[in-house]
Amino acid sequence: MEFTKALIKGKLIKRYKRFFADVKIGKEIVTAHCPNTGSMKGLLDEGNMVYVSKNDDPKRKLKYTLEIIKVKKNLVGVNTHFANKIAFHGLVNNLVKEVANNDSIKAEVFFDKETRFDFLVEKNKQKIFVEVKNVTLFREEKTAEFPDAVTTRGSKHLKTLIEAVKKGYKSYLLFLVQIEGVDNFKIAKDIDKEYYENYLLAKKAGVNFLAYQCKINSKEIKIDKKIKIINA
C-alpha cells in the first residue's frame, strides 16, 4: 500500500483523548489525527520520531494524520484503517503464501447476522475466511505481541472462526505485524488471558494462525515476510 504523498517527519509531543496527537514539525507544533483508538502501549513516549501525512482538503479540521512511530530503532505503522488495505494488497499479489494463487477475494463478507470477516477467499473451490488483526505491540526486542489491551471483540472473532470451520470453511487469522525488526510473534496472555485461552481453543478446532511482518517506510507499507508464532 503506497501513501499518496511522501510522509513528513516530526517528533511526538503527546497523544490525548484517543483521537489527537501533538507533533512537532520543525519549529511548529501541530495537532494530528490519531487513527488508532487502541492503547498503543509502548509507542507514545515523548520525543519519539513520527511520520505524518498531510491532507490540504479545506473541509478537514485536522490536516495531519499520524501514520508511523519510531520506537527502539523500529518503525511501527499505527494507522489501523490501513491494515485491511495492506492485507488486501498482500492477498492480491500472492504475498501470503498460504492463500496464494487464489481465484477470488471479497472484502467484508458476512458469516452470520452478527459477524462479518475481513475477507472471503476462494481457491480450488474451497471457501476461506481471513480475519486480520493489526499488531503494534513489542515489549521484547525481537517479539511482536497481540493484543495490547483486553479485546472482547477479538475473542468473539475467534469463537466465530471456530464456527466457520465447523461449517466447512477454511479459516485463517492473519496477525499483520506493522513492526520492523522483530523475528517472532506471540499472544500477550498476561494482557488478555481469555483471548489466549480462546486462541488455544481455536487452534485445536482447526483455525489457522499466521503472522506476517510488514516492510515500512515513508512511501509505502506492504507485507514482507512470514514470522514464527512462538505460543504453545
Swiss-Prot record:
CDD domains, alphabetized: SfsA-like_bacterial (cd22359)
InterPro entries, alphabetized: SfsA, SfsA_C, SfsA_N
Pfam families: SfsA, SfsA_N
Name this protein carries in UniProt: Sugar fermentation stimulation protein homolog
Primary gene name: sfsA
Family, as annotated: Belongs to the SfsA family.
GO MF, one annotated term: DNA binding
Domain of life: Bacteria
Source organism per UniProt: Pelagibacter ubique (strain HTCC1062)
